[in-house]
């Protein structure tokens, strides 16, 4: 797709500095700039790199700049770059229809313009919303509801009674609604706690590949609107996540934990059961949160066990000083031993 800088600027509400008739057909990342492309550059070093490349033009933020290359200036260059990715590389459109190998149960309702791919199983009583896409080898349980414009990728399993919102994306091999890991030790054995609940995924959620979200013991495990979940995440039974959370890979959230809105879990965070996390908390990578803790609004937590950032940094600095402190204590102990020996000698002389 060829587009002039003038047309691109109109698309992203930007301003061209230089020849706006120049056309480009592709975008480039700053670390692999293709000849004749449009490259997004942020920061002085990256802009210089782009200027010295074979790029046709540079997408930059606002500000006064002289450049030998044509520029498109925008208020938010990263947002503009996302819009241009969709413009130059639009997602493949799948024609609606039901593949002949799909198995559709009794009283299943398929909305308008739905695609059901090869070997998909939809059990009885489930509802699939308008314009939704179910790719191959998906299993949809009994009485599941899926909203409009939702895309589910291959090998996903959604258990009975789960509720999936609109504009949701679920990536390959994720499992929604499996039993929670609930057992109690009785009479010398682990007695399984039955799970009769379900999972609610609200609108505009994206869930990565190979993630598991367990159903509640009773009621619902909830993933709030706009939340984005990475690959390889475990969300346990009866967890309730607020709106617009970010959960990075290898994070595990144990049962009955609740979060507010706009909470960020960096990679490999471990949250124990019955934790309450208020709005806008940030948990740094590999943070560990003990059971029944209450994390305060807007606080950044680090370490294991989790501590507010300033406290965690002081603790880490103190730990790093332990070898020096031990060395100093050893030296002082040796000096005290020498002094005691001298005092013992003098005491004997006095006697």
Swiss-Prot record:
Q: What EC number is given for this enzyme?
A: 2.3.1.191
State the Gene Ontology BP annotations.
lipid A biosynthetic process
Q: MF terms per GO, please? A: N-acyltransferase activity
InterPro entries from the UniProt entry: Hexapep (IPR001451), Hexapep_transf_CS (IPR018357), LpxD (IPR007691), Trimer_LpxA-like_sf (IPR011004), UDP_GlcNAc_AcTrfase_non-rep (IPR020573)
> Catalysed reaction per UniProt?
a UDP-3-O-[(3R)-3-hydroxyacyl]-alpha-D-glucosamine + a (3R)-hydroxyacyl-[ACP] = a UDP-2-N,3-O-bis[(3R)-3-hydroxyacyl]-alpha-D-glucosamine + holo-[ACP] + H(+)
Alphabetically list the UniProt keywords: Acyltransferase, Lipid A biosynthesis, Lipid biosynthesis, Lipid metabolism, Repeat, Transferase
Question: Does the record carry Cytoplasm as a key word?
Answer: no
Q: What class of enzyme is it?
A: transferase
Q: Do the record's keywords include Metal-binding?
A: no
Give, as in the UniProt entry, the pathway in which the protein acts: Bacterial outer membrane biogenesis; LPS lipid A biosynthesis
Q: Which residues form the active site?
A: 237
Q: Which CDD domains match?
A: LbH_LpxD
Covalent S-S links between cysteines: none
Top-level taxon of origin = Bacteria
Q: Which GO terms describe its cellular component?
A: membrane
Q: What does this protein do?
A: Catalyzes the N-acylation of UDP-3-O-acylglucosamine using 3-hydroxyacyl-ACP as the acyl donor. Is involved in the biosynthesis of lipid A, a phosphorylated glycolipid that anchors the lipopolysaccharide to the outer membrane of the cell.
**PANTHER family in the cross-refs:** UDP-3-O-ACYLGLUCOSAMINE N-ACYLTRANSFERASE, UDP-3-O-ACYLGLUCOSAMINE N-ACYLTRANSFERASE 1, MITOCHONDRIAL-RELATED
Please give the family membership noted in the entry. Answer: Belongs to the transferase hexapeptide repeat family. LpxD subfamily.
Q: How does it assemble?
A: Homotrimer.
Question: What is the protein name for this chain?
Answer: UDP-3-O-acylglucosamine N-acyltransferase 1
Species for this entry: Legionella pneumophila (strain Lens)
């Amino acid at each position: 797709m060829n587009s002039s800088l003038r047309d691109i600027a109109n698309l992203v509400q930007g301003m061209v500095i230089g020849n706006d008739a120049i056309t480009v057909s592709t975008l480039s990342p700053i670390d692999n700039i293709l000849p004749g492309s449009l490259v997004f550059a942020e920061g002085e070093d990256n802009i210089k790199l782009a200027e010295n490349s074979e790029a046709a033009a540079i997408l930059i933020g606002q500000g006064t700049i002289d450049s030998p290359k044509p520029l498109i200036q925008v208020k938010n260059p990263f947002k503009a770059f996302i819009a241009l990715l969709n413009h130059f590389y639009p997602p493949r459109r799948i024609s609606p229809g039901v593949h002949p190998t799909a198995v559709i149960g009794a009283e299943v309702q398929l909305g308008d313009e739905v695609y059901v791919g090869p070997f998909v199983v939809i059990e009885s009583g489930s509802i699939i919303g308008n314009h939704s896409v179910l790719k191959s080898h998906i299993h949809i349980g009994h009485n599941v509801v899926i909203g409009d414009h939702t895309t589910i990728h291959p090998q996903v399993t959604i258990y009975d009674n789960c509720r999936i919102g609109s504009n949701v994306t679920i990536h390959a091999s994720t499992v929604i609604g499996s039993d929670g890991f609930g057992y109690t030790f009785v009479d010398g054995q682990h007695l399984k706690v039955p799970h009769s609940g379900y999972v609610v995924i609200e609108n505009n959620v994206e869930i990565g590949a190979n993630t598991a979200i367990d159903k509640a013991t009773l009621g619902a495990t909830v993933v709030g609107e706009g939340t984005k979940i990475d690959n390889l995440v475990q969300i346990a039974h009866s967890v309730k996540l607020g709106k617009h959370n970010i959960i990075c890979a290898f994070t595990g959230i144990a049962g009955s934990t609740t979060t507010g809105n706009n909470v960020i879990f960096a990679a490999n965070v471990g949250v124990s059961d019955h934790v309450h996390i208020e709005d806008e908390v940030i948990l740094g990578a590999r943070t560990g949160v003990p059971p029944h803790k209450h994390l305060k609004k807007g606080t950044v937590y680090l370490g294991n066990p989790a501590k507010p950032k300033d406290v965690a940094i002081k603790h880490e600095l103190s730990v790093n000083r332990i070898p020096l402190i031990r060395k100093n204590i050893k030296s002082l102990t040796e000096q005290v031993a020498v002094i005691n020996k001298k005092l013992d000698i003098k005491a004997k002389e006095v006697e």
